[in-house]
Amino acid sequence: MKKLYDAVQRFCARHPRFGIPNLMLYIVAGNVIVYLLMMFTQANDANALAFLTLNTSAVLKGELWRIITYVFVPTSSGIFWLLISLYFYYWIGSTLERQWGTAKFNLYYISGVLLTAVGVLIASLISGQSYTVAGSYYVNLSMFFAFAFLFPDTQVLLFFIIPVKMKWLAYLDGALFAYDVVRCLMAGNWGGALLPIIALLNFAVFIWPEVHYMA
């Protein structure tokens, strides 16, 4: 992991202009546009945006755009919670970009997107079933863990009332993440257990070595 981490650091130092500045603004805008298309076309059923989701069988048939477009599928069908989640992850992502620089943040986000695709492929090969991912849940979770590591004492209002530090929310999400993995393993669902682990490998590459540097 340390060698990969050092390679990332060198790349970012040599190519500081790599990537798309304010990337999260485009991700948020894409989610809003897709949501509006759903609303105006009354395409609210589960199959309406099937051409955007990350599906193993479809990708292997040449529909390579799905490797990227799945992150634009809204994670919530309710406008209120969609706007709240988009604002929250825009805040997290833009803060990480200011902290790391555009190059490193773009690498982190893009690697999360691609690792999720790799995880879906491996899970499908192991299980013999075609996995589908709609929305950027794992990418967002990876961003959240990175933010909580860098800014553990930052407070947010849980349910708009209760002040909670990011590190405690990260511990809770980490516990739920581990529970889901263990539950899949106990059920013999090896693909379902590997998918989230592979999807969050960018956290291990970008963040975990910093734990040792800080120790």
Indicate residue ranges for each PLM-predicted region:
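N-terminal TM1-TM2 helical hairpin plus the immediately adjacent luminal interfacial "cap"
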Residues: 12, 16-113, 117-118, 124, ...
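C-terminal transmembrane module of polytopic alpha-helical membrane proteins
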Residues: 1-20, 121, 175-215
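Hydrophobic alpha-helical transmembrane segments of polytopic
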Residues: 24-34, 109-112, 145, 169-176, ...
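A cytosolic-side transmembrane-helix exit/cap motif
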Residues: 128-131, 155-162, 213-215
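Membrane-helix boundary/juxtamembrane motif in polytopic membrane proteins
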Residues: 153-173
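Aromatic-anchored segments of alpha-helical transmembrane domains
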Residues: 32, 36-37, 113-121, 148, ...
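Hydrophobic core segments of alpha-helical transmembrane domains in multi-pass membrane proteins
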Residues: 83-88, 136-145, 161, 191-209
